[in-house]
């Protein structure tokens, strides 16, 4: 059995998690998820039904991680030999920029792709764009 099971859809943010899996040279099974027909194994691991999701088949038992940024941080922590994580002095910036990219930047890009434009500075603020 592979060390990880990776559930994703090519049109999701799963490519970010896939990159991280490759960076740590993880042994993983790649499972493509159809948006409308989510398999029971996937929903048992992640009842929210969101991709990407990984299952880490650790010696102490299976661990489920979802959300691209969380998967990247988890893999960096589990595979220190890959040197993806920060030093202690870099930790604050590492967390700030990781969550900024996963939050406001991602929301703004998605809104733009969906052709949604905030109509006022108040809407931009409420959406977390600024």
Predicted ranges, named:
Residues 130:
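Aromatic-anchored helix/helix-loop segment that forms the rim or "lid"
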Residues 1-126:
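GST-like domain detector, emphasizing the conserved glutathione-binding G-site
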């Amino acid at each position: 059995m592979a060390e990880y099971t990776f559930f994703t859809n090519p049109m999701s943010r799963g490519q970010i998690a896939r990159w991280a899996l490759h960076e740590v040279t993880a042994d993983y099974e790649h499972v493509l998820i159809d948006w409308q027909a989510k398999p029971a194994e996937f929903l048992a691991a992640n009842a929210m039904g969101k991709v990407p999701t990984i299952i880490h088949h650790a010696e102490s038992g299976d661990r489920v991680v979802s959300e691209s940024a969380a998967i990247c941080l988890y893999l960096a922590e589990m595979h220190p030999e890959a040197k993806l994580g920060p030093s202690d002095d870099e930790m604050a910036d590492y967390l700030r920029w990781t969550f900024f990219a996963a939050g406001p930047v991602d929301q703004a890009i998605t809104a733009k792709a969906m052709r949604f434009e905030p109509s006022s500075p108040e809407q931009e603020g409420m959406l977390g764009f600024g």
